[in-house]
Amino acid sequence: MQRSLVGSEMCIRDRYQAVPKADKLEQIIQKSVELGVTRIVPVLTRRCISRPKPAECQKKLPRLQKIAASAAKQAGRGIIPEVAPMLTFAQACAEMQQADRAILLYEGGGVRFDEADLHDCRSIALIVGSEGGFDPEEAEQLQQNGAVAVWLGHRILRCETAPLAAISIVMHRTGNL
């Protein structure tokens, strides 16, 4: 059976991921690409347990990009998503405003995911914390910059699990699942 390649029908353009510890970023990239994210952006936040130097992150980029390429091929995607260089929190706040909608997964509250307005969104930026979540001041700053805080219910999900649930919800709500 011949499969056609899937283009960029997914509307989650960017996934801003606070830097997790160890090799979790590799799994995060792989699964996000399989689900249709176009770009993964590591971000250094206050509660990141892992605090790599920019040069260390730059050195890992080719390997992370290979993981993205492999996941794209496995998923039959027509494009290879980008793994961007690590950004500071301030850089991520400024950059995420380019999306039609920015969604902050926040364990500290917000609207239920099914209440978030996704109508007429051609691009969504998904913002995800590390193992320690977001500092309340960072969450406030993200919201002041236009992010809508959403929560996934009463369970506290791991930093590598919560975004997969969120991406799946967005895919379903936008007709891509």
Could you say what each language-model-derived stretch is?
Residues 50-126:
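S-adenosyl-L-methionine/SAH cofactor-binding core of RNA-modifying enzymes
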